[in-house]
Amino acid sequence: MGRAGTGTGGEAVAAVVAGPLLLLLLARPPPASAGYSGKSEVGLVSEHFSQAPQRLSFYSWYGSARLFRFRVPPDAVLLRWLLQVSRESGAACTDAEITVHFRSGAPPVINPLGTSFPDDTAVQPSFQVGVPLSTTPRSNASVNVSHPAPGDWFVAAHLPPSSQKIELKGLAPTCAYVFQPELLVTRVVEISIMEPDVPLPQTLLSHPSYLKVFVPDYTRELLLELRDCVSNGSLGCPVRLTVGPVTLPSNFQKVLTCTGAPWPCRLLLPSPPWDRWLQVTAESLVGPLGTVAFSAVAALTACRPRSVTIQPLLQSSQNQSFNASSGLLSPSPDHQDLGRSGRVDRSPFCLTNYPVTREDMDVVSVHFQPLDRVSVRVCSDTPSVMRLRLNTGMDSGGSLTISLRANKTEMRNETVVVACVNAASPFLGFNTSLNCTTAFFQGYPLSLSAWSRRANLIIPYPETDNWYLSLQLMCPENAEDCEQAVVHVETTLYLVPCLNDCGPYGQCLLLRRHSYLYASCSCKAGWRGWSCTDNSTAQTVAQQRAATLLLTLSNLMFLAPIAVSVRRFFLVEASVYAYTMFFSTFYHACDQPGEAVLCILSYDTLQYCDFLGSGAAIWVTILCMARLKTVLKYVLFLLGTLVIAMSLQLDRRGMWNMLGPCLFAFVIMASMWAYRCGHRRQCYPTSWQRWAFYLLPGVSMASVGIAIYTSMMTSDNYYYTHSIWHILLAGSAALLLPPPDQPAEPWACSQKFPCHYQICKNDREELYAVT
């Protein structure tokens, strides 16, 4: 069967030597353990695929993983993945292990956080490998997959889960981890085609023989048989057959070893995948010097479908347009040829086809329903089958939801409706087994009874293929009770981007990798999981309201600097503080998830105004402390605010958006204070009370607030630490505002309007002079 192996290397085979390494891989023959030898190189060709590297992120949700999509050609016999990882050299770079997930047909369903999935969700663990980065800044790993399934293969890579710490962009040193996968495909070009019921002679030497057989629609069974086996190196028939492809994470590839097996050697495959080529590899087990001769025969058992008549429906809906799965309406001439060339099942019918309408509603959003828009009739003689076409290549990025509901009046205590959901081919063996297993796929079972008339199934990221829903009526206690029984089942079949739109505590986001689109949920308020349904760390409604009140009411602390500014006639500064208080309050009221939400404007507008107000408040406070000339101060107020607005438009979360203007304002303030100290030959401000009761407490509050804002905030304590930041910022502004200008002396010159008299103070004598 297919193997997946890993290997790690050091700096000598790092990303910088990826080109020479791939040339060596191209020149080297496949390993002998995979069943290949140098003589088989004549019939094998190699192809190389690569994608641009991407910077990895620490995992917090599915959007943190970097997704790569590769197209594997048909007749591939070996995949060699070269996984290259590199990092920057610096103190910020630590040892880490990159996790790489693989899946065939759809993006891998991963769960690094160990969260729970919604009820009725079918999840298969992903196949993954780890690439450590410890002593060297570069590392690589290789993964081999023999006999891979053709079509789309997806690779997802990510760093370990994040620490949930909120860091300012540009403040803390960062480390870039870069990942690049490359794919080397070995495919066979010399392959023999097996025709149904026609023996195909084969002679095996030291290299394997590659065969393939086409399985058309409505094939119930495929029988592979080895006949007339002759070997000169051992007794019996030393041949190993490998049938079918490898699909990670699950693998149902069949391996038949005929040594010592009953003669003739046979392999029966129920419900093989329809409408595709099935690859068969024959290998000799006698060693390099022995030969084995045999004849391979493929026998197909045709399935006669009973089709639901839809002509009256089509005639009554001529003005409507449907995209129907017409392949399920009636047997085509090809199906009749299959019956003549293969074997026809003796029963009159093996399944009942129900035509299905596919309605494309939006991106990764499809609605399936029976063409007659009524329920499906389920009986006991044959399965009722519905085909869901999810083979466009763009349908694997959502979630397939299936909901069944049985008619209450028709369900009796002794009857059970059994359903199976399978890809590639329907499950038809309800009379012999209920495990929903076809030749190369483990299906998903559902059941309806008188006690449970509803059944649901959710398949995240379904594989690109035709999916089939099979239903049949069963009577476990007495089969005769089901002979005349009929149950109508209502089906609700959807492909949705996100289940329930991620609920009230999540947001469904559409992600893109080149032209491929897929969806995922981003959760809030402590909710986690695939659809934001895991409440193990969730906040209660009371906690959400308390958090909202903390973040909004803490802005009332800005009333203190507003009052101080008005009292000291700093009206422009008071206006800036009022603006900051207003938009910070309503931004945080809109930023909350769940029920405690209030948005008076769009979220983006509120966020921009909040960031602008915060930067402008710090800017005007520092400039006000500089005690500039009135005209110059207001000019700098305006210019600084315009610069902050421009920088926020360029990068809203950049650290230098606020730090740059604030440092410039601090330089102006320090220069003015130094000038006054030199001019007056004493410390400025001159009053020790000003230093002790205003400046030092204000600077201390601002320093503590900056420390909390830059180094202590996490996703868990954000509501408390950010509220403290609001209080400290507003309190420091109230303390740092300078006192008003000194009032005019009684004898200072003042202009009397409108009489145009000027009263002046005489420095030599206390007399008034009227001019």
Curated annotation (Swiss-Prot):
Residues of the signal peptide: 1-34
Tissue: Expressed in pancreas, placenta, spleen, liver, kidney, bone marrow, peripheral blood leukocytes and tonsil.
Main location, first listed in the record: membrane
Effect of D610A: Abolishes shedding of CRIPTO
Transmembrane segment boundaries: 546-566, 569-589, 606-626, 630-650, 654-674, 691-711, 718-738
InterPro entries in the record: EGF-like_dom, NGX6/PGAP6/MYMK
EC class name: hydrolase
UniProt-listed GO biological process terms: lipid metabolic process
Entry keyword Methyltransferase: no
Disulfide bonding pattern of the chain: C498-C508, C502-C521, C523-C532
Cytoplasmic side: 567-568, 627-629, 675-690, 739-771
Induction: Repressed during activation of CD4+ and CD8+ T-lymphocytes.
Post-translational modification: Glycosylated.
Positions glycosylated per UniProt: N144, N407, N431
GO molecular function (one): phospholipase A2 activity
Function: Involved in the lipid remodeling steps of GPI-anchor maturation. Lipid remodeling steps consist in the generation of 2 saturated fatty chains at the sn-2 position of GPI-anchor proteins (GPI-AP). Has phospholipase A2 activity that removes an acyl-chain at the sn-2 position of GPI-anchors during the remodeling of GPI. Required for the shedding of the GPI-AP CRIPTO, but not CFC1, at the cell surface. Shedding of CRIPTO modulates Nodal signaling by allowing soluble CRIPTO to act as a Nodal coreceptor on other cells.
Name of the molecule in the record: Post-GPI attachment to proteins factor 6
Organism: Homo sapiens
Gene from which the chain derives: PGAP6
